[in-house]
Swiss-Prot record:
Residues 109-129 are annotated as: Disordered. This is Chromatin accessibility complex protein 1. Its main location: nucleus. Residues 104-120 form a coiled coil. Pfam families: CBFD_NFYB_HMF. Heterodimer with POLE3; binds to DNA. Component of the CHRAC ISWI chromatin remodeling complex at least composed of SMARCA5/SNF2H, BAZ1A/ACF1, CHRAC1 and POLE3; the complex preferentially binds DNA through the CHRAC1-POLE3 heterodimer and possesses ATP-dependent nucleosome-remodeling activity. Within the complex, the heterodimer with POLE3 interacts with SMARCA5/SNF2H; the interaction is direct and enhances nucleosome sliding activity by the SMARCA5/SNF2H and BAZ1A/ACF1 interaction. Within the complex, the heterodimer with POLE3 interacts with BAZ1A/ACF1; the interactions are direct.
């Protein structure tokens, strides 16, 4: 009976968590270190995830440009992840968007720079020989 009440308040059908527990369980089981998942741990992980998402959204909304429009955008989330020391670990997951043409130009410049470095290294090797 106690397991049936997990994830729901005792005095009603209002759930303690909004995220689907089955999805959280699948994500947790995808880790090779996890062999079994306790129901209480599952509910606590789901609640912690909700609180984290709420914190990220609140910080992004407060510091983002979407406040004037009363909207939260991807760029607000990416900026918050990059600027906040606490959320810095998300910078790789939430990169700032750039145009494909800019990205291709950056790749080309990087490739040319690497080729120049290789050419400089081969000249040095020939001079020593």
């Amino acid at each position: 009976m106690a397991d049936a009440a997990v994830g729901k308040e005792k005095c009603g059908d209002q759930r303690l968590v909004s995220l689907p527990l089955s999805r959280i369980r699948v994500i947790m089981k995808s880790s090779p270190e996890v062999s079994s998942i306790n129901q209480e741990a599952l509910v606590l992980t789901a609640k912690a995830t909700e609180l984290f998402v709420q914190y990220l959204a609140t910080c992004s909304y407060r510091h983002g440009s979407g406040k004037a429009k009363k909207a939260l955008t991807y760029s607000d989330l990416a900026s918050t992840a990059e600027d906040s020391e606490t959320l810095q670990f998300l910078a790789d997951i939430l990169p700032k968007k750039i145009l494909a043409s800019k990205y291709l130009k950056m790749l080309k410049e990087k490739r040319e720079e690497e080729e120049d470095n290789e050419d400089d290294g081969s000249d040095l090797g020939e001079a020593l020989a």
